[in-house]
């Protein structure tokens, strides 16, 4: 089985993106995976937020290589446990494996599962390629604003899920444990003041979600988790420092 890790970033992230590139390069080399790190965007009309370009990169890999699976990984994340194999998350009868952040209202849609595009697996099948094209075409008419607003392609992914577009439920496995491969870095308010409204994800940072940590649920990074994801406005001022710090904590064996 051939697996590729894919990530994309723009030059304004150069100050710290190299840390993630090196982190995943070492992990890929150790586990015999390919790594595709693209710096820059594809030409699109009209213009879209860089997050949308992840779809173009994944589709390019699927169409031009013999890769069996692509693991998309946002560039603001680090792999913390090099002993964990990507194969351990595979579901052979699925085309996409994507984690759920939990229940809440997302992009104006009430949902029992908010799917997160920060990290997910996609299999090299015709359905997957058709789905990526379909998702790319989604932001039009009343959804046109999501080309550059909100959570971009993730809003589209959740729309596809809630509307069961392209028989979504028959092709996609929803990983109930977001922390399986997408743990968010989070500091308690007494350590660093933060308003949840700044990045709109307060509903999965509630006291109720903290109870789920005992069952490996919830979304916040805990020591020993596979990946730490430095997403959100609260991370922006300290992202480079955090990534340098956590790069020294990787489990190699």
Predicted regions and their residues:
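A residue-level signal for conserved active-site and pocket-lining positions in enzyme catalytic cores
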Residues: 5, 28, 58, 76, ...
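Aromatic-acidic/polar surface patches that form glycan- and anion
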Residues: 13-17, 47-51, 109-113, 121-124, ...
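Short, solvent-exposed loop/turn segments at secondary-structure junctions
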Residues: 10-12, 42-43, 77-78, 102-105, ...
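GT-A fold catalytic core of metal-dependent nucleotide-sugar glycosyltransferases
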Residues: 47-132
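N-terminal anchoring/stem segment of glycosyltransferases
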Residues: 1-67, 126, 253
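Short beta-strand/turn micro-motifs composed of small residues
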Residues: 7-9, 98, 229
């Amino acid at each position: 089985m051939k697996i590729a890790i894919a990530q994309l970033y723009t030059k304004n992230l150069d100050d710290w993106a190299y840390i993630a590139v090196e982190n995943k390069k070492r992990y890929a080399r150790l586990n015999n995976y390919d790594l595709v790190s693209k710096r820059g965007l594809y030409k699109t009309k009209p213009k879209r937020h860089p997050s949308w370009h992840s779809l173009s990169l994944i589709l390019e890999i699927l169409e031009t290589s013999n890769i069996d699976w692509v693991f998309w990984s946002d560039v603001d994340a680090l792999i913390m446990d090099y002993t964990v194999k990507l194969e351990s998350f595979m579901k052979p009868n699925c085309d996409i494996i994507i984690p759920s952040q939990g229940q809440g209202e997302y992009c104006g849609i009430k949902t029992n599962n908010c799917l997160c595009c920060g990290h997910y697996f996609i299999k090299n099948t015709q359905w997957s390629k058709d789905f990526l094209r379909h998702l790319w075409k989604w932001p039009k008419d009343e959804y046109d604003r999501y080309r550059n607003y909100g959570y971009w392609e993730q809003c589209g992914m959740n729309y596809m899920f809630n509307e069961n577009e392209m028989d979504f439920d028959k092709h996609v496995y929803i990983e109930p444990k977001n922390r399986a491969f997408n743990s968010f870095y989070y500091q308690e308010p007494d350590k660093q003041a933060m308003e949840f409204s700044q990045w709109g994800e307060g509903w999965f940072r509630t006291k109720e979600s903290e109870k789920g940590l005992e069952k490996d649920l919830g979304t916040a990074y805990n020591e020993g988790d596979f990946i730490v994801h430095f997403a959100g406005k609260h991370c922006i001022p300290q992202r480079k420092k955090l990534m340098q710090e956590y790069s020294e904590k990787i489990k190699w064996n």
